Regions:
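Accessory carbohydrate-binding/adhesion or oligomerization-edge regions at the termini
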Residues: 6-57, 61, 75, 129, ...
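N-terminal carbohydrate-binding accessory modules
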Residues: 14-15, 22, 31, 173-176, ...
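Substrate-binding clefts and catalytic carboxylate motifs of secreted carbohydrate-active enzymes
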Residues: 16-35, 48, 54, 151-154, ...
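Accessory beta-strand-rich segments of carbohydrate-active enzymes
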Residues: 18-20, 30, 65-171, 200-201, ...
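Beta-strand-rich binding/interaction modules
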Residues: 100, 187-229, 239
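Surface beta-strand/loop "capping" patches
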Residues: 166-202
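Aromatic- and acidic-residue-enriched carbohydrate-binding clefts of CAZyme catalytic domains
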Residues: 302-307, 362-391, 397-404, 408, ...
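Aromatic-lined substrate-binding rim segments of carbohydrate-active enzymes
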Residues: 326-378, 388, 434-447
């Protein structure tokens, strides 16, 4: 969501979002007392965010695992303290403890989804210090437990300081859908907006919520407003539906046209909060027998798997570099990116919207072939010890819910994927794998009925034990696309990975197992929706360069 208060009578407490990326102090290791305001960090390195423990980063399987501390000083005025103060993180791998002026503001576990903390009670006039203790230590009850990647620590995505009125729209607190679009074949639709309005005061507050839909040129197409009340220290959930909008410009990879919902909260005639949410009018259908359709048009997508890391930077990639990756893939002829194998940054989804790239967004439930006993990211994807099961499932569900809340308004996203190759689990853990996948699918349907829940990397087991039909879409990696069980499987399906063989060898060329003959894709297999090559770019791997291509 973009945010701005302007153009009307705005209260001095109206929302301001401040880039908080510059002038941090960093030191690798764990240090007693580093959360204190008087801690001496004069010999620490000065860094900017995004930042990674692994900078400089190249294709080595070895990386630092442990703790790192970040500290930053910032000034606040008496006017600032009249507002609610929040610090927002887009991603910290993998555990973060946040302190403000020596007081713990909160902790978050999960390396690929954003979070925020209210720091109002800890802040004071003058100089303030925020300190963040980060670790990337493998844990048996935190997702992911395994994966063919490099799990670098750090505050590797953007940070913001956000000042808000005590009555405000919650973090990613709007959900925009277009429920009539498919039935009307793209000619018209209402816009439904669900909004969470928070009240941090100790009294009931009456407010007005004005919701406007604007086109790309800023023209207001429709609006709806409601007067509501929100009880003290609580959140009010509102649902508004506009009049139908005609003559729509549909979002498509060839013409990624975006509209905006502008949500404004008033007390009396005074604007106290405003949030802008870009969205697109588009509808899609995954079918079991005819493939994938976008805006009523059959589309056999040519997809590509993309990790978030880049040479030198590791996972600490700038927004411009993310966009460059998307543009390179688009130039190469791809029209879908599978976000391998975890939620990517909000800026990545935004760039997919703006540049016209379909996006398959994946939760971090991930396995790796040849898994070993617990202790590192080559362990069983699902816990082998019963005592870890409950916390691990809670971790996977938490990160799935955060992924959906953060990314749900992006028109580029056409599927939520629950996992990648979760079958790389100990035999005794497979019952738990199925149970967790079912829970994740059910949660996805509850949180976002407008998109399907996919099972990525579902090419094993075969026969009666298969997992691909637990969700709405089956994704098959490697040889899974050729297995008899997955030919015309009776559900929407994709080849979620193929290729990946790279070699330099003397003699005549001989095809590898991943080579595919150039063809029109869907001809002969009309039930297949598309395919995604492994992979778009070289990436870091715990197995080293032999698997990082």
């Amino acid at each position: 969501c973009g945010t701005l208060c302007a153009d009307v009578q705005a209260d001095e407490l109206c929302r301001q979002s401040i880039n908080f990326n510059r002038n941090w102090k960093y030191m690798r290791g764990d240090y007693t007392g580093a959360e204190r305001t008087d801690y001496d960090d004069s010999n620490w390195e000065t860094v900017g965010i995004p930042h990674s423990f692994s900078i400089p980063y190249f294709m080595s399987k070895d990386f630092y695992t442990g703790y790192g501390w970040y500290r930053k000083s910032f000034e606040l005025t008496a006017k600032d303290l009249k507002q609610q103060l929040f610090v927002e993180f887009d991603g910290v791998f993998q555990e973060a403890e946040v302190f403000v002026n020596g007081k713990k503001a909160g902790a978050h576990t999960g390396g690929y989804t954003g979070f925020y903390f209210d720091i109002s009670s800890a802040a004071h006039v003058g100089n303030n210090v925020i300190a963040v203790r980060v670790n990337n230590i493998w844990k048996a009850n935190v997702a992911p437990r395994a994966g063919e990647h490099v799990f670098s620590g750090g505050i590797y995505r953007n940070v913001r300081l956000v000042r808000k009125s005590p009555v405000y729209i919650d973090w990613y607190g709007t959900f925009v859908t277009t429920p009539d679009l498919a039935a009307n074949q793209g000619k018209s639709s209402v816009v439904r907006v669900c909004t969470d309005v928070c009240n941090k005061t100790d009294k009931m507050v009456v407010f007005k919520l004005l919701t406007e839909v604007k086109d790309a040129e800023g023209q207001i197409l429709v609006s709806v407003e409601n007067e509501e009340k929100v009880e003290a220290d609580s959140t009010k959930k509102l649902e508004q539906t506009t009049e139908s909008i005609n003559h729509l410009t549909l979002w498509h990879p060839r013409h990624p046209y975006l509209y905006r919902v502008v949500s404004s909260v008033f007390q009396g005639q005074t604007l106290i909060d405003r949030v802008e949410t870009p969205f697109g009018f588009r509808w899609f259908e995954w079918t079991a027998d005819k493939g994938f359709f976008l805006n009523g048009e059959h589309l056999f997508f040519r997809g590509v798997n993309v990790h978030q890391d880049q040479a030198g930077w590791g996972d600490a990639v700038t927004e411009a570099a993310m966009r460059r990756d998307i543009l390179l893939m688009k130039e190469a002829g791809f029209d879908l990116i599978r976000g391998s194998h975890y939620p990517h940054a909000p800026a990545f989804s935004q760039a997919c919207d703006e540049e016209g790239m379909l996006f398959w967004s994946e939760a971090p439930f991930w396995g790796i072939g040849g898994f070993r006993p617990d202790g590192y990211w080559d362990s069983s994807a699902y816990p082998v010890d019963r005592k870890d099961e409950q916390a691990f499932e809670a971790s996977a569900l938490q990160q799935l819910e955060e992924m959906i809340r953060i990314h749900r308004n992006h028109p580029s996203i056409v599927a939520w994927s629950m996992c990648n190759e979760a079958f790389f689990s100990a035999p005794e853990a497979m019952k738990g794998v199925r149970r967790l996948l079912k829970r994740m699918v059910d949660l996805t349907h509850q949180l976002d009925p407008s998109r399907p829940a996919a099972i990525g990397g579902a090419q094993r087991p075969l026969g009666d034990e298969r997992i691909d039909k637990i969700g709405d879409i089956g994704g098959y990696n490697g040889d899974g696309a050729t297995q008899r069980d997955f030919q015309n499987p009776g559900i929407p399906n994709v080849v979620s990975e193929y290729g990946s063989v790279t070699a330099e060898r003397p003699g005549e060329y001989s095809p590898g197992w991943g080579d595919l003959q150039m063809n029109d894709g869907w001809k002969g297999t009309p039930w297949r929706s598309g395919q995604a090559i492994w992979c778009g770019f070289d990436h870091g791997s715990i197995a080293g360069s032999q698997l990082g291509k």
